[in-house]
Curated annotation (Swiss-Prot):
Name of the protein in its database record: Glutamate--tRNA ligase 1
Self-association state and partner proteins as the record states: Monomer.
Organism superkingdom: Bacteria
The keyword rRNA-binding appears for this protein: no
Motif residue range(s): 'HIGH' region: 9-19
Keyword Aminoacyl-tRNA synthetase: yes
EC category name: ligase
Gene behind this protein: gltX1
Taxonomic lineage of the native organism: Bacteria, Pseudomonadati, Pseudomonadota, Alphaproteobacteria, Rhodobacterales
The protein's Enzyme Commission number: 6.1.1.17
Subcellular compartments: Cytoplasm
Sites where the protein binds ATP: 242
The family this protein is said to belong to: Belongs to the class-I aminoacyl-tRNA synthetase family. Glutamate--tRNA ligase type 1 subfamily.
A GO cellular-component term linked to this record: cytoplasm
């Protein structure tokens, strides 16, 4: 049987690293088994779903190389949900309810005060036909699924054996009074119709899974296998939000995080395997195993992405960055030498721009007061550009002879005068790239 997985985000905001974890696991399972990966946009919320978020989700996944085989939109399947709802009504598994949110809240509080679980009391099943007709006229009804009050069990791919007593769960609301089909129902219909065989999602969906198993069975379908990964928290243990901009994929991309660095961290975070940098999707897939992930909440610190990004960037061949370097205005003759000099001194590729500005426009000299006279003497001995690989050695030898300085007292002030920095690439490699020197003799 072909493995079919899906990633089903709601386009109500930009996706963050928590969403990515779900997407990556489902993508990896499909790709590793030669199966099908579906991107399904769960956009039945007409008020909050936006095309800009749908576009952003697809752009983020494309940036990461998480390609999909099929694109589905729930908004295109409303007729199918209506058909499935009709089937369940005729089977006696859908029933109409009329309580207002306030009335439901009062019932819930009363049960809690009595020390009982806040489970819906199925009062709507006891209404007469006359009462239903009257209430339907007065306020309109919403629809619940009638759960079989028995234990729902499955072997979870991460959490192990799961058993939930359906009697401890309220019959889920599947269609609102305004006709909007809710996630629990639409997702169940889609997963059966689309032949989904394996679903990985967050541990906050475990109860949903129990009810959806019954919904799928009531439709005559075979529920897929499930695995529920732990939820990510922020570095301090705080909950992640889809609208928490600093952890959205958009923001991480803007900060220069490389796709493979992000995927490498997410493919191992919360598992029994150590985090390591993968340079290709194939390397990542070879070591991926959903069974290695644990149930405990997992802390995500965005700062962990930058050592991985630095490692990834510094290992890139010139051919991978040639176009970016040329776009900075680096002459072809200097492009490859520039990369050799700059690559070990950048954290993200965006840092290349700063280095080329330094080389092409000159750096603001950093001159300590006690070195001012020394720098004036030294700069008087520096010829005009262009410079060659031998320039640094010849110049520092001349300065040493003229001033008597040597060692760090010679080299550090000269470096700071030319580059504005106390540390950096070898100056013998820097000199051929310098187009301008702003320090004066």
């Amino acid at each position: 049987m072909t493995t079919v997985t899906r990633f089903a985000p709601s386009p109500t905001g930009f996706i963050h690293v928590g969403n990515l974890r779900t997407a990556l696991m489902n993508w990896a399972i499909a790709r590793k088994s030669g199966g099908t990966f579906i991107l399904r946009l769960d956009d039945t919320d007409r008020e909050r779903s936006k095309q800009e978020y749908s576009d952003a989700i697809m752009q983020d996944l494309e940036w990461l190389g998480l390609t999909w085989d099929r694109l589905e939109r729930q908004s295109d399947r409303l007729d199918r949900y209506a058909e499935a709802a009709g089937d369940l009504r005729r089977a006696g598994r859908f029933y109409e309810c009329f309580e207002s949110p306030t009335e439901l809240d009062l019932k819930r509080k009363k049960l809690l005060n009595m020390g009982k679980p806040p489970v819906y009391d199925r009062a709507a099943l006891k209404l007469s036909d006359e009462d239903r007709a009257r209430l339907r006229e007065e306020r309109g009804g919403y629809w619940r699924f009638l759960l079989d009050q028995e234990r729902i069990e499955w072997t979870d791919g991460i959490l192990g054996p799961i058993s939930i007593d359906a009697a401890s769960v309220s019959d889920p609301v599947l269609i609102r009074a305004d006709g909007q089909v809710l996630y629990t129902f639409a997702s169940s219909v889609d997963d059966i119709d689309m032949g989904v065989t394996f679903i990985v999602r967050g541990a906050d969906h475990v109860t949903n899974t129990a009810t959806q198993i019954q919904i799928m069975q009531a439709m005559g379908g075979t529920p897929p296998s499930f695995a529920h990964h732990s939820l990510l928290t922020g570095a301090q243990g705080e909950a992640l939000s889809k609208r928490l901009g600093t952890l959205s994929l958009r923001d991480l991309r803007a900060r220069g995080v490389e796709p493979m660095a992000l995927l490498s961290l997410m493919a191992r975070l919360g598992s029994s395997q150590p985090v390591e940098l993968f340079r290709t999707h194939e390397e990542l897939l070879a070591g991926f195993d959903v069974g290695t992930f644990g149930a405990a909440p997992t802390k995500f610190d965005a700062e962990d992405l930058f050592p991985l990004t630095r490692h990834y960037v510094q290992g890139l061949p010139f051919e991978a960055v040639a176009e970016r370097i040329r776009s900075l205005g680096v002459p072809d003759a200097l492009a490859e030498p520039f990369w050799r000099v700059a690559k070990d001194n950048i954290a993200v590729l965006e840092d290349l721009g700063g280095w080329w500005t330094l080389f092409s426009e000159g750096a603001e000299p950093q001159i300590d007061p006690e070195d001012a006279d020394f720098i004036r003497q030294a700069m008087a001995l520096l010829p005009e550009p262009p410079y060659g690989p031998e320039t640094w050695g010849q110049w520092t030898a001349a300065v040493k002879e003229a001033t008597g300085r040597k060692g760090k007292g010679l080299f550090m002030p000269l470096r700071k005068a030319l580059t504005g920095q106390a540390h950096g690439p070898e100056m013998a490699d820097v000199m051929p790239l310098l187009q301008t020197v702003r320090a004066k003799g």
